[in-house]
């Protein structure tokens, strides 16, 4: 890995940071506040929330697969990013008027609640469609197009830090719109909140239209649309692209470990005998430290490559989970969280850069859909249930997205660490593959 690093211009860096951050802000709203909104506004049940999460995950996967192949066939990324981001923003703004619309259309409160739940789930899928079109499919394909194996570690160091940094932005902004009832119940001014977030996303789409350069991928010709879509799921494709699919398998295992922990992480910190409502004073600095570590570690990934850099963040993740399992004192929770989050983001940067390095140049769009299937859909269908199962002795078993009746146990961290150990087996296979191909 001694190649001269390919430079990335300032304007391109600005576009990367802007689209990555704002995209993750929008996803943070979808992943965290839609769940709260559907409960606060319409009294949704935990099963309603679970249905919404599952429907959204399936929508994201199918959209990324279909649009990824489409963008490969037409040889364009920018148009999808710009158009998708603009409509994505308007779809978020639509949530600002859902309560008013349901009140006007429904006959009574019960009908308004049922209609509100249905509309929220439907609009969540619509919002996810445009978000996945713009971000998961087109932006990530563009990011692969414009980078190479000399600078992808740096880019992924920045890109991988955005999901947690966006949580700080979203929750910090939401605190300004927080409403506390006389009985202590916390809710938010949702119309203003969704309008502001939607406007930010729309403005980002306009900025992308002005600043973003087309990556000009070569348009694919020959195969039919469905044949190209099926290509990524064939055993022959996995055999012909063994390094890519091994990295995807390793990322899938690690993402399952993360999904054992992360849906319950904030709920755990907020438990009165852990940190209570002061959890933000521990989580926020940990996120900043972990993000800084990942941005800097990305440079090391570029210099040394995947196999030489993946072990450290995996060990940090396991060590952090071990501390969080064994201790509940605030200093231990801080150190454990710092290690776990640093390991989480660092591992994601390593895996993401390696996936881009092994992605076939003529199937970049399709590969984004395969990535979402392997590292988002499958882990979301597996990990949360493991987390809820190990916590069953100390709380009501639930899907783990929201729910005040659910009390996660520290065993979620032990389970997450245990699942992550299987990642070491896959990384060993990756090293064997690299030696065999050398």
Q: Model segments located where?
A:
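Structural signature of the two symmetry-related core transmembrane helices
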Residues: 79-94, 308-323
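Helix-to-loop junctions at the C-terminal end of transmembrane segments
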Residues: 62-76, 293-306, 391
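A membrane-interface helix-boundary motif in multi-pass transporters
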Residues: 77, 110-112, 178-199, 389-419
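Intracellular juxtamembrane helix-capping segments at the cytosolic ends
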Residues: 133-147, 346-360
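Multi-pass alpha-helical transporter architecture, strongest
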Residues: 96-100, 202-212, 409-438
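Juxtamembrane intracellular "pre-TM" segments in multi-pass secondary transporters
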Residues: 1-10, 215-248
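Helix-loop boundary and gating motifs at the non-cytosolic
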Residues: 2-57, 243-250, 254-273, 280
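Glycine-rich segments within core transmembrane alpha-helices of 12-TM secondary carriers
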Residues: 61, 153-178, 372-384
